[in-house]
Amino acid sequence: MEDFVRQCFNPMIVELAEKAMKEYGEDPKIETNKFAAICTHLEVCFMYSDFHFIDERGESTIIESGDPNALLKHRFEIIEGRDRTMAWTVVNSICNTTGVEKPKFLPDLYDYKENRFIEIGVTRREVHTYYLEKANKIKSEKTHIHIFSFTGEEMATKADYTLDEESRARIKTRLFTIRQEMASRGLWDSFRQSERGEETVEERFEITGTMCRLADQSLPPNFSSLEKFRAYVDGFEPNGCIEGKLSQMSKEVNARIEPFLKTTPRPLRLPDGPPCSQRSKFLLMDALKLSIEDPSHEGEGIPLYDAIKCMKTFFGWKEPNIVKPHEKGINPNYLLAWKQVLAELQDIENEEKIPKTKNMRKTSQLKWALGENMAPEKVDFEDCKDVSDLRQYDSDEPKPRSLASWIQSEFNKACELTDSSWIELDEIGEDVAPIEHIASMRRNYFTAEVSHCRATEYIMKGVYINTALLNASCAAMDDFQLIPMISKCRTKEGRRKTNLYGFLIKGRSHLRNDTDVVNFVSMEFSLTDPRLEPHRWEKYCVLRIGDMLLRTEIGQVSRPMFLYVRTNGTSKIKMKWGMEMRRCPFQSLQQIESMIEAESSVKEKDMTKEFFENKSETWPIGESPKGVEEGSIGKVCRTLLAKSVFNSLYASPQLEGFSAESRKLLLIVQALRDNLEPGTFDLGGLYEAIEECLINDPWVLLNASWFNSFLTHALR
């Protein structure tokens, strides 16, 4: 049978069928009848779609070989044969564009003329039997069903056969030929008997033993068993008066629904206290790069070689001294650590062959900075379980901090354009279907808007640092490895450029669990004088390490160069997410895409080109105390990207809590704006849940202040 399938069907169909079977863990060499059935079904779907187009007047037309320049659109979108993720993407896109109800199961085709999804069936049994099985499985009146059999019979929903006689005859003839070919090889009987009915997943699976007891224990009050709870839930009518439903749920609940009016919400209370401080793993707007253009030195691409080459571009090194000490740290150790880096880099250069990695000597200053031997000794629980006053450390609650202006400046800077490109346009191959062409066009427009954005630089920097640190943590667990902080970009003229921001030194890293911490010391170049905002840099010890000549309109000026040094830590799971910062553009691209989809459905055509090329139109970007801020579509793309990047850079439990809880209040306010007359109960409890996340995190405090601006303008 396998040989027959490979001879009988087009190689592309065979390849798609193999892929589909592998996706479900099935082997085409073993389940040969299933292999043949999938190939047959795919071929019928393709034949159904072949030669059917919609012309410029919106009429359905059949063209077998005509003018390639005619403005024709394929009448059918083929969904069958794509991998599941792509297939659902196509289905979602069609539903968003056309407003058709989303099907529960993946259909096979979409008919742009009749505006409906089609489920194609090919059966070796009675068409009526198979039709009923399909209809029972799909349970949707919106999806059109069309069944063919190998005996030339067919059946379709409401006897509406969609295609003309001739097109259907072609399909029936092909099925009859396949049957004859199989019969002549003695394969038909086995194939005919192997067809199973439509398989539907049984939704109720039995819970037994411990899980059953746990389920019975974890029910809401007044329910004695899971079965009774299930019966109650199945019979629960969701529409109707909320208060009645609540009282029906439990004797404990007596919620009073209060109307939510324009005057109801109050602003969020932001904490008082000293201004919040910088807590990102690396400097953002204040970072300074030492760069080389068109790098072609020996060992180019090896981080240590690149770093040494970048260091040689700067000639203003001076004897370092401390200009802003760290409040709690032993500051001379930070100074000695930098001197040690300079000395050991010098040692490398004196060697004949520069090594690929550099492990620092374990000096007392580095041991102190990396917390070596500082962890309390671990004792086996068996040895101390009898200690009467055994308890956990008392940990101090975080002290509240107030919102500082620097975090808004930091965000504004992330939305700006730089003079370099930080991402290349992907080479993804030719587009085949119309939907792929639209997707590529959107991606290219979006990439053009964000490739020069500073937030994109932060993505590449974050990915590089986290990847290098995770690699070193696994490969050199006991070593204090020196890791250069590097990024690569292209100048306006298209020349390659390698940048050095500074160095990290990794501490001991025996990371068994995802949350085990590896300490590191970061040393980063900057031209920002820390004394202007000392509260912002409280976790840093800042050294002055030299003077840099800068070209300005008035000629060359000399500016002091600083080194921001701090002890920091991260974990395997944080590094894993840091390495995946390239996902940020996807999130913002999806948000832009939903804006385009909304516009397209109003205009009933794809608006991608107009959306990006109409430079005169402005779009809402966000709220500020001044009102709704507006900007070009490029600015919207960059702002959305910067938000996504900052969510990654400043990820924290406070942000998780604030995002989840404030969203509830946001939805209530949106309902009020849409005149849906929302009602609430325990609004005070919701405010409490939001405000307990407003402690000291700069990004959360900024988001809360934006939320307050939104409340003010939304409820005018």
Swiss-Prot record:
Gene: PA
EC number: 3.1.-.-
Protein name in UniProt: Polymerase acidic protein
Cell location: Host cytoplasm; Host nucleus
Cross-referenced Pfam families: Flu_PA
A single GO cellular-component term on record: host cell nucleus
Disulfide cysteine pairs (residue numbers): none
GO molecular function, one term: endonuclease activity
Keywords, alphabetical: Cap snatching, Endonuclease, Eukaryotic host gene expression shutoff by virus, Eukaryotic host transcription shutoff by virus, Host cytoplasm, Host gene expression shutoff by virus, Host nucleus, Host-virus interaction, Hydrolase, Inhibition of host RNA polymerase II by virus, Manganese, Metal-binding, Nuclease, Phosphoprotein
Summary of the function given for this chain in its UniProt record: Plays an essential role in viral RNA transcription and replication by forming the heterotrimeric polymerase complex together with PB1 and PB2 subunits. The complex transcribes viral mRNAs by using a unique mechanism called cap-snatching. It consists in the hijacking and cleavage of host capped pre-mRNAs. These short capped RNAs are then used as primers for viral mRNAs. The PB2 subunit is responsible for the binding of the 5' cap of cellular pre-mRNAs which are subsequently cleaved after 10-13 nucleotides by the PA subunit that carries the endonuclease activity.
Cofactor entry: Mn(2+)
Assembly and binders: Influenza RNA polymerase is composed of three subunits: PB1, PB2 and PA. Interacts (via C-terminus) with PB1 (via N-terminus).
Lineage: Viruses, Riboviria, Orthornavirae, Negarnaviricota, Polyploviricotina
Enzyme class: hydrolase
Motif placement: Nuclear localization signal 1 (NLS1): 124-139
Transmembrane segments: none
Motif (Nuclear localization signal 2 (NLS2)): 184-247
GO biological process: cap snatching; DNA-templated transcription; symbiont-mediated suppression of host gene expression; symbiont-mediated suppression of host mRNA transcription via inhibition of RNA polymerase II activity; viral RNA genome replication; viral translational frameshifting
